[in-house]
């Protein structure tokens, strides 16, 4: 994905480089439980404006969303409004959600909306059809084209429409992503769950978490029970999007901020299933919470 600062839009950026396979490889990708051999067809009207909500429900795979000849406006990240931003290619990490507004051309046609797997030549998607009965073009689930890795290109351009009130942090928690260690272990701050050492917060605090990722791949980091704002990427502060899942790419650093206003014990983990079950997990615990029932080994 590339950003054109003149046209102010996202599009494909093509690069030559060494192919790096992910540590888990699939044989197919699905959109609404269907492959591109028989994709879902959504009938629309010429000139109509539609909203498409994308949900990355995969256990592992991140995606590039490809609108083809159409252009969309990104309106929401993880259900939180952002200043609208245009493009034909968008990034979507595991557990994230994106809401796009797309206006169909006045000329009837068939318009595939594709989701390409990260570091993969597999794809899936749905089809918008404004020409009833028009023959579907062939859409191969697997191609000769491979994609690269997700990065900060998209989040660097996004601005929250309802940002957090300006406030200094009361509590800063460093989180160094760790792995892969022997026996396919992944962790946080060189520790591998289960252990009983939560990230402590107090009611009403402005909390910041500072992520660094020296691992060879990106990690979608998800905090339960809270929405946070991305406030810094690679040392550059900004008023970024509100989210509940942030993708921290290989070699990347970012800072998130949230207000601790939901007392309890909340899971915090990489949303790649194979990573959090191998140790990239902990909990955020309020000092006021009852921890007697929390059993990390269970």
Protein language model regions, located:
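Short solvent-exposed strand-capping/beta-turn motif centered on an Asx-Ser/Thr pair
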Residues: 55-60, 212-216
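Acidic-aromatic/histidine active-site loop/patch
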Residues: 1-49, 55-58, 180, 186
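Short beta-strand elements of extracellular/lumenal beta-sandwich folds
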Residues: 46-53, 205-211
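Substrate-recognition/cap regions that form aromatic- and gly/pro-loop-enriched pockets
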Residues: 196, 218-226, 234-236, 247, ...
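Short acidic, flexible loop segments centered on an aromatic residue
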Residues: 56-73, 222-228
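Extended terminal and domain-junction accessory segments
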Residues: 1-6, 82-218, 238, 259-265, ...
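Short strand-edge motifs at loop-to-beta-strand transitions and within beta-strands
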Residues: 40, 88, 96-100, 244, ...
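Solvent-exposed beta-strand/loop surfaces of large extracellular or lumenal domains
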Residues: 67-94, 231-245
